[in-house]
């Protein structure tokens, strides 16, 4: 492709609102153009990258036995009502009516649609298992779209769905699709980790995320320094502490702590280690009017996903209202604790072996020092309530945990009967008996993969594309292409020879200054660059450089095509 026939639109500066490197560089490189908050046009250069990702995905889906179809963007409300997600999904589901006042939505996922198709088309165990996928535009009405295509309202995803006669078949396909996702991200040149994860709004049982490692990632993953264990921090369990509880040394003492409402201010006011404090979180119980008290160390981070699964706790997790707290505790938030509270109390494992805690006294502006479980209040039930921290024992018992940030680019689920039961997706088994199908789903955020790859692969000059994702493999930058016959003839000849060799080449024949052409080639991140100028040609050379770190070097013009093709095939 010649640049004069293509469309290149680069910027020297990124918009002020762009926070992430990927957002800045995608705008500057002209990969995307914003149309509205969270809505983008994929420009020709960006679309080439998107198609490269899709091609790899299609190849690996076919290898895994998944068959492509294409489901609609606009979905009928009755399917979502049947599954129970019409109201549950909340405001992120964009609802609309047609001219006949019938309800529809812009689909953020396609579980309901594919379940409806399968129940109409498959009725016998002889037709199972089946694995379908599509690559389609999705819409999720994010309350605050940000970070460019990383968290946009409109995005492109690969969704695959499998249907089975039994769980063993589901597990086999789940494993195959897990492996397919690993191959996809490996082929795309990404540093990633598969991690055990929560099922979230999709539901089901078993679940793994695929996290691209990046400091800008919104997610935190925990992994063992010894074994293959890895999980999203939301799911990684903490283990009960070993050994005996420390002996109580202090008496329970009520201390006046005026205007002390946070752990930070408590630590400063009493000049104590934060590890000696307990913080109180009050949530609604399952029964009307019941409150549940949750206790964890002041330096630990509360995990609401774990808390929501506790017996007696209302789901979805709901924080107690200030009025309800005052009614049952006699104090406001910031001064709460278990002394005198008669409701259910859970305490985190990390508090079980400690003694002489500092905690709220259930009286505004007062705290207790020297608090001990069993002596000053009944023993709580000790459970896992917090996020893991670096140095915690790995849940598999092998090594210690480390933490890293990641960007979720894929997610696989064992949905089991979540949708097939609700929507009566059934088949006749070999005994002629009706059975509910087992179901799995397997997603990749195609547009997010592009942004995540840039987060991992950039420098001060611009993007550094991996081999599989680059919009072009080679860029030829001729100096004075319009004015120098010698340069133009050499550039055209090398361009033709590389095309004949099967390379994906961009000949930048724009009538621009040399600095613009060179800067754009680096900003766009094309892996291989050939610079052709009159001075080097007089010596029989061209300048060749790889975008990823290699210095430019002179290469004989007669050898450049072989040199580049060898690098492309390496």
Swiss-Prot record:
Location(s) in or outside the cell: Cytoplasm
Predominant cellular place of this UniProt entry's protein: cytoplasm
EC number(s) recorded for this UniProt protein: 6.1.1.15
Catalytic activity: tRNA(Pro) + L-proline + ATP = L-prolyl-tRNA(Pro) + AMP + diphosphate
Gene Ontology CC entries for this record: cytosol
GO biological process, one term: prolyl-tRNA aminoacylation
Keywords assigned by UniProt, alphabetized: Aminoacyl-tRNA synthetase, ATP-binding, Cytoplasm, Ligase, Nucleotide-binding, Protein biosynthesis
Pfam families, sorted: HGTP_anticodon (PF03129), tRNA-synt_2b (PF00587), tRNA_edit (PF04073)
SUPFAM superfamilies, A to Z: Class II aaRS ABD-related, Class II aaRS and biotin synthetases, YbaK/ProRS associated domain
GO MF term list: aminoacyl-tRNA deacylase activity; ATP binding; proline-tRNA ligase activity
Gene3D superfamilies on file: Anticodon-binding domain, Bira Bifunctional Protein, Domain 2, YbaK/aminoacyl-tRNA synthetase-associated domain
InterPro entries: aa-tRNA-synt_IIb, aa-tRNA-synth_II, aa-tRNA-synth_II/BPL/LPL, Anticodon-bd, Anticodon-bd_dom_sf, Pro-tRNA-ligase_IIa, Pro-tRNA-synth_IIa_bac-type, Pro-tRNA-Synthase_IIa_type1
Entry's family note: Belongs to the class-II aminoacyl-tRNA synthetase family. ProS type 1 subfamily.
Entry-linked NCBIfam families: PRK09194.1, proS_fam_II
Cited function: Catalyzes the attachment of proline to tRNA(Pro) in a two-step reaction: proline is first activated by ATP to form Pro-AMP and then transferred to the acceptor end of tRNA(Pro). As ProRS can inadvertently accommodate and process non-cognate amino acids such as alanine and cysteine, to avoid such errors it has two additional distinct editing activities against alanine. One activity is designated as 'pretransfer' editing and involves the tRNA(Pro)-independent hydrolysis of activated Ala-AMP.
Subunit structure: Homodimer.
Notes on the domains: Consists of three domains: the N-terminal catalytic domain, the editing domain and the C-terminal anticodon-binding domain.
Name of the protein in question: Proline--tRNA ligase
Originating gene: proS
């Amino acid at each position: 492709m010649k640049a004069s026939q293509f469309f290149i639109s680069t910027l020297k500066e990124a918009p002020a609102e762009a926070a992430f490197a990927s957002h800045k560089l995608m705008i500057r490189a002209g990969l995307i153009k914003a149309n509205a908050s969270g809505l983008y046009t994929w420009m020709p250069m960006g679309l080439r990258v998107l198609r490269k990702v899709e091609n790899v995905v299609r190849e690996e889906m076919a290898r895994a036995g998944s068959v492509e179809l294409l489901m609609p963007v606009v979905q009928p409300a009755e399917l979502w009502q049947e599954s129970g997600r019409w109201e549950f999904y909340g405001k992120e589901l964009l609802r609309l009516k047609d001219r006949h006042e019938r309800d529809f939505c812009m689909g953020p996922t396609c579980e309901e649609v594919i379940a409806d198709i399968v129940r109409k088309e498959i009725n016998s165990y002889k037709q199972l298992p089946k694995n379908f996928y599509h690559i389609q535009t999705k819409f999720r009405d994010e309350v605050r779209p940000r970070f460019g295509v990383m968290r946009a309202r409109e995005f492109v995803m690969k969704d695959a769905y499998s249907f089975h006669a039994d769980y063993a078949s589901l597990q086999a396909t789940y494993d195959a699709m897990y492996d397919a996702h690993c191959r996809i991200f490996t082929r795309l040149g990404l540093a990633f980790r598969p991690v055990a994860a929560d099922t979230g709004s999709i539901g089901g049982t078993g679940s793994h995320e695929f996290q691209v490692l990046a400091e800008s990632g919104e997610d935190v993953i925990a992994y063992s320094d010894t074994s293959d264990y890895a999980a999203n921090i939301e799911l990684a369990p903490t283990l009960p502490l070993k050994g005996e509880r420390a002996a109580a040394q202090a008496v329970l003492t009520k201390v006046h702590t005026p205007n002390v409402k946070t752990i930070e201010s408590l630590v400063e006011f009493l000049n104590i280690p934060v590890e000696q404090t307990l913080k109180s979180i009050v949530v609604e119980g399952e029964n009307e009017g019941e409150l549940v008290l949750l206790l964890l160390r002041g330096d630990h981070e509360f995990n609401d996903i774990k808390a929501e699964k506790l017996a007696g706790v209302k789901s979805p997790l709901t924080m107690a209202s200030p009025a309800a707290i005052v009614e049952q505790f006699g104090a406001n938030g910031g001064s709460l604790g278990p002394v005198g509270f008669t409701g259910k109390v859970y305490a985190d494992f990390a508090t079980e072996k400690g003694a002489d805690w500092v905690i709220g006294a259930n009286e505004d502006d007062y705290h207790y020092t020297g608090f001990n479980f069993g002596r000053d209040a009944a023993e709580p039930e000790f459970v896992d309530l917090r996020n893991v921290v670096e140095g915690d024992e790995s849940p598999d018992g092998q090594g210690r945990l480390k933490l890293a940030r990641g960007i979720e680019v894929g997610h696989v689920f064992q949905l089991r009967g979540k949708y097939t039961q609700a929507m009566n997706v059934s088949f006749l088994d070999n005994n002629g008996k009706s059975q509910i199908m087992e179901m799995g789903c397997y997603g990749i955020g195609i547009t997010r993969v592009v942004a995540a790859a840039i987060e991992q692969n950039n420098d001060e000059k611009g993007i550094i594309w991996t081999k599989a994702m680059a919009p072009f493999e080679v860029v030829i930058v001729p100096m004075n292409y319009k004015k120098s016959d010698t340069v133009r003839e050499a550039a055209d000849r090398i361009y033709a020879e590389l095309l004949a060799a099967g390379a994906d080449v961009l000949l930048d024949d724009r009538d621009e200054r040399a600095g613009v052409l060179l800067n754009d080639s680096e900003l766009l991140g094309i892996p291989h660059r050939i610079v052709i100028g009159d001075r080097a040609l007089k010596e029989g050379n061209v300048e060749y450089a790889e975008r990823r770190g290699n210095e430019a070097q002179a290469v004989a013009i007669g050898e450049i095509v072989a040199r580049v093709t060898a690098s492309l095939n390496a």
